[in-house]
Amino acid sequence: MFSRARPRKLDTEDELYDEALRALMRRAHSVHEMKQKLARRTDNELLVRVVMARLKENGQLDDERYAQQFTRNRTQSRKQGKFRIARDLRARGVADNQINAAIEDAAATTDTVAMVRQRIERKMRACRGEMDERKIASIYGSLLRAGFPSDVIRKELKNLTREEVPETDAE
């Protein structure tokens, strides 16, 4: 019914720059993401480099700031752990040193143990019946995928379920 037409190729620096600004108004982008987005809109690699340099020079594109905002959002809103956040930032092309700095800053204001405990309690409320090994393993896997350290997960599961949680290193 609806066909998604290909966006037309942009030929001038101003058109490409305006497209970049529209994308940045919708959400923040890493340098890598923006470069990919602009490259899809033009065949001129030089034009992409010029627009990228202009965005960086004007302070509209900064991976360090992006990593800080992304990390803060993921820890506060989505309650995700540092491993998941780092993986997602790497997928967005952010450098490891910027990722580590952002995670360290967020760690100063985030209580990982409390976040793990809250997620376990929420999962336990959702589980019907008695907590068996399968349900505990499911919660454990869910928290690992959310990016929390396995030792913190095991400790909190043990505290909240008063059962022995198997020792596995699946970080």
Task: Tell where the protein language model's regions lie, with residue ranges.
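An alpha-helical, amphipathic repeat domain used for nucleic-acid recognition
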Residues: M1-E171
